[in-house]
Each structure stands twice: as C-alpha cells, then as structure tokens.
C-alpha cells in the first residue's frame, strides 16, 4: 500500500473519493446525521494512512488536486441564489440584517470563549473565521497570524456539526421559515451546512448560498477589528 501511494500520482485523490463514496453509501443506508459523508471520509482516510504508515505529505501529493476545486465549487453555489433572485430582492433588508447579526454573534462568541479559556492571541485569531467557507477563511487566518492547519480543522468541525444538528436546532427553536433556516445554515456552518440546506429545500439552499458569500465578506472586514481585542 505504501508503494502505491509513492508511485501513483493520483493515489490521494483515489483514496479521498472512495472514502467519500463509503460515507455517502452509509448515509443513504442508515439515514442518520452522524453518518455525514465528509466525517466518514475523514475517519476512513486517517485509518488507511495510519494502517499503511503513509505520511500526510505523501498522501497530499495526489490529494492536493481536490483543493483546486474548492473555489470553483463555492462559486457554483451562486446558481440556486440566481434562481431565487426575486425572493431575495423582496427580503433584502431582513436578510442583510440577519446575516450581520449572525456574523457579529459568531465573532463575539469566539472572543468570549477565548477569554474564558485563556487562549493566546494566535489561538484566538485561528478560530475567528470558523463559520465562513474555507476558501476565504484560510486567507483570513493566515493574514491575522493564526494557525491555518488548525483553522481548517475548525472549519470541518463547525460545518459537520451544523450539517448534523442544524435541522434539529431549527425544530427546537421552532424556526420554520425557509429563508431564516437557509440563512442560519449558511452563516453558521458554511458550505457543509449549505449541503444540508439544499437537501431541505430550494429556498433554504439559495439563502444558505447567499449567507456564505455575505458572511464571508463581513467576517473579512470585522475579523481585523476583533483581532485587536486580544
């Protein structure tokens, strides 16, 4: 197995896709949120690498090509937004106010918890962009002096938790309005949460896609201000 990773240019991509396929099959079979395809693919990939004694750099030689698709995939989320453009125009003020509140709440939460836990400045800024898409958040973390690799892990945890528990939270707080649900998913758990929003409905998916873009821009602007709080 180790030789396969060293000699094959696309070994990393192959393992990643097969792992995700396994996750998708388990999700369809058991229909439980815990069987999130991304979460399952991470676990399977790590297990294979550990058992095969393959280091990350060797794996990433082939897997890095998937990273190139990250930004184009994020841009494609504009399609459902375009399809719901009229709905957005009629609710523009409420949408923007809700997203602004969501971003500020996210940043304040990170600040308060970092203070309580006594985190360093580097740890604090590492988690500031936790709720925005990876394509934007990695740049924010690097610019502020955070640990980018840890930021990516925080993105994944935030997204998976939103994907798994987001719908349950909406039920608990009796959030039934499609626009509100979509904005909540997108602003709190970026693209991974948006995948769940798209499953729920077309309007939810479109609003979640909008939330990714707007929340990303607002976070880029406000995170520089919040970075000086610690």
Describe every region a protein language model picked out.
Residues 121-150, 156-157, 172, 176-214:
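Alpha-helical membrane segments and immediately flanking helix-loop junctions
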Residues 39-51, 71-76, 97-109, 128-138, ...:
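Small-residue-rich segments of transmembrane alpha-helices in multi-pass membrane proteins
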Residues 7-8, 59-60, 93-95, 121-122, ...:
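Short alpha-helical transmembrane interface motifs in multi-pass membrane proteins
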Residues 105, 157-165, 189, 211-223:
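Membrane-embedded alpha-helical segments of transport systems
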Residues 115, 221-230:
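Juxtamembrane boundary at the C-terminal end of a transmembrane helix
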Residues 97-135, 158-175:
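Transmembrane alpha-helices that form the ion-translocation and gating core
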Residues 2-16, 20-81, 87-98, 102:
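Helical membrane-embedded segments and adjacent short helical loop/helix-boundary regions
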